[in-house]
């Protein structure tokens, strides 16, 4: 990218060190493309999520794969995976996290999911592979607390049993708690894999750029144009967590639209 003239500014947090408006007004950029993704992990806001041994799936997989934690101390990014690991969630990332934990020599790995197997959002083959590798599925169970020892480390999770209620307006059966059905599972590592969303930093400092209720930027599907003049956006920050292919496609469409926008602006 540098070879074709792209200048890369590192350690520059847009929305904190300067805003989108400042980029355009003080730094004289004619157009801005926002492609900050949807990498902010969701947590459950339950007791014990701040204990040692609790990871988001983002951090867990990033440490294991990109930062090569499995080769510590050769690489200086350790990750402490205990003998018993609970992964909370039912998507593809949850399956990836569970299978990765096994490869890091965990003796027992659980998938904790509040609905039944039929409702698992992960691909069918991911579920089958996880089962073949020995991962135990704790279905129709919901995590309500993470329990710690006197030193602040995870020692167990507390779950409550669920049952599927009547279908709602969308036809989906929502899980309902079964009263007085709480139980504990001894674990020493917990991975929360319940999805991720956009970091609100740029959106919150750009009030005239519209977002949806999830915090994603509203942009034209074909051009990436937002509701703010000269500002374009694409990828997961618009669609929510999706695929690399879709993000690349959005970038190409936006590049064409930005080029046309700049030409039109010069000719005015």
Locate the predicted segments by residue.
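Feature captures the FAD/FMN-dependent oxidoreductase FAD-binding
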Residues: 1-46, 145-158, 163-166, 189-191, ...
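Rossmann-like dinucleotide-binding cores of NAD(P)H-dependent redox enzymes
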Residues: 1-3, 8, 98-145, 268
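FAD-site-proximal beta/loop scaffold in flavoenzymes
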Residues: 50-82, 167-241
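Rossmann-like NAD(P)H-binding beta-loop-alpha module
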Residues: 70-106
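Cofactor-binding loop segments of dinucleotide-utilizing enzymes, especially the Rossmann-like FAD-
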Residues: 90, 113-116, 148, 236
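A conserved FAD-binding loop/helix module that cradles the flavin
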Residues: 234-265
């Amino acid at each position: 990218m540098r070879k074709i003239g792209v200048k890369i500014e590192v350690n520059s947090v847009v929305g904190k060190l300067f805003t989108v408006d400042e980029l355009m007004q003080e730094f004289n950029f004619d157009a801005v493309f926002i492609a900050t993704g949807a990498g902010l992990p969701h947590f459950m806001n339950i007791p014990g999520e701040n204990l040692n041994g609790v990871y988001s799936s983002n951090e867990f997989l990033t440490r294991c794969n990109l930062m090569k934690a499995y080769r510590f101390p050769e690489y200086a990014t350790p990750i402490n995976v205990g003998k018993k690991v609970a992964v909370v969630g039912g998507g593809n990332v949850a399956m990836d996290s569970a299978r990765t934990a096994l490869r890091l020599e965990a003796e027992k790995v659980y998938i904790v999911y509040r609905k039944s197997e039929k409702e698992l959002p992960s691909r069918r083959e991911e579920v089958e592979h996880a089962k073949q590798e020995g991962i135990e599925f704790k279905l129709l169970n919901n995590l309500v607390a993470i329990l710690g020892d006197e030193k602040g480390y995870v020692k167990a999770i507390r779950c409550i049993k669920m049952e599927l209620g009547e279908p709602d307006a969308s036809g989906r059966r929502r899980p309902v708690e079964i009263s007085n059905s709480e139980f504990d599972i001894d674990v020493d590592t917990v991975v929360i894999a319940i999805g991720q969303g956009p970091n609100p930093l740029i959106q919150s400092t750009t009030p005239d750029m519209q977002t949806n209720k999830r915090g994603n930027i509203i942009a034209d599907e074909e051009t990436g144009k937002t509701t703010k003049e000269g500002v374009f956006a694409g990828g997961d920050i618009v669609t929510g967590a999706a695929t690399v292919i879709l993000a690349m496609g959005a970038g190409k469409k936006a590049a064409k639209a930005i080029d046309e926008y700049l030409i039109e602006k010069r000719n005015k």
